Design a protein with these regions (language model features):
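Long, low-complexity, intrinsically disordered polar/charged segments
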Residues: 1-2, 98
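Helical element adjacent to the flavin cofactor pocket in flavoenzyme catalytic cores
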Residues: 2-58, 66
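Active-site substrate-recognition segment that forms the wall
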Residues: 37, 53, 63-166
Length: 166
C-alpha cells in the first residue's frame, strides 16, 4: 500500500520532545515508582505508590504492556493485554535510498504487516512481526521472526540489500 499522507518520525526523539514540552507546561514526572492504588475524590486523584501518595488532577496511563494493570485499578470493566513481540531488520545507511517512502503491506488480523521504510537517520527499516507471547518482558529476537520480516519485505520490494543488515 502506498500512503502519500504517511510520515516518518524518530519515535525516540519525538517522545523526548513531547516530554520536554509537557514539562515546560507544568507536567511533573515521577519515575521508578510502582502505582499500588488509585482513588478519585471529586476532581482529584490520589496516586498511591511504593514511595508515597501523590495528588493530581490528571493521570496518564503510559504503562505500556502493563497498562491493563493500571486500567483495572480504576475501571469496573477489566481488560488483559496480551504482549506481542515485533522483530525488525535495520539496514545500514548505504541501503537507505532503496525506497523513498514507507511501503505498507495489506494489514491482517495480527497487525499492519511487514513494512519497508527509510528512517529519519537515513537507514532502511523492515518489520515488524507481531507474535503473541506470554512474558511481558520478552524482548528477544528470533531467527524465525527475522526470516518472516525478510520474506514479508521481499513480497513488496525487490532486491533489498540484506547484506546491509546491521
Amino acid at each position: 500500500l502506498y500512503a502519500p499522507s504517511a510520515g516518518i518520525v524518530c519515535p525516540f526523539h519525538l517522545n523526548i520532545a513531547l516530554a520536554e514540552n509537557a514539562n515546560a507546561n507544568g507536567v511533573e514526572f515521577k519515575f521508578d515508582m510502582e502505582v499500588t492504588d488509585l482513588k478519585k475524590t471529586g476532581e482529584i486523584w490520589e496516586v498511591h505508590t511504593n514511595q508515597g501518595v501523590f495528588e493530581t488532577k490528571y493521570v496518564v496511563n503510559a504503562a505500556g504492556v502493563y497498562a491493563d494493570k493500571f486500567h483495572n485499578m480504576v475501571s469496573e470493566k477489566k481488560i488483559h493485554i496480551t504482549p506481542r513481540r515485533g522483530d525488525y531488520c535495520l539496514l545500514d545507511k548505504s541501503a537507505g535510498n532503496h525506497v523513498s517512502h514507507t511501503i505498507f503491506a495489506l494489514p491482517g488480523k495480527y497487525g499492519k504487516g511487514i513494512l519497508i521504510t527509510p528512517t529519519v537517520h537515513g537507514n532502511l527499516l523492515l518489520g515488524p512481526t507481531a507474535i503473541d507471547i506470554e512474558d511481558k518482558e520478552g524482548t528477544n529476537t528470533t531467527r524465525e521472526g527475522l526470516d518472516q520480516v525478510i520474506a514479508g519485505a521481499n513480497l513488496n520490494v525487490k532486491n533489498i540489500p540484506m547484506r546491509q543488515v546491521i
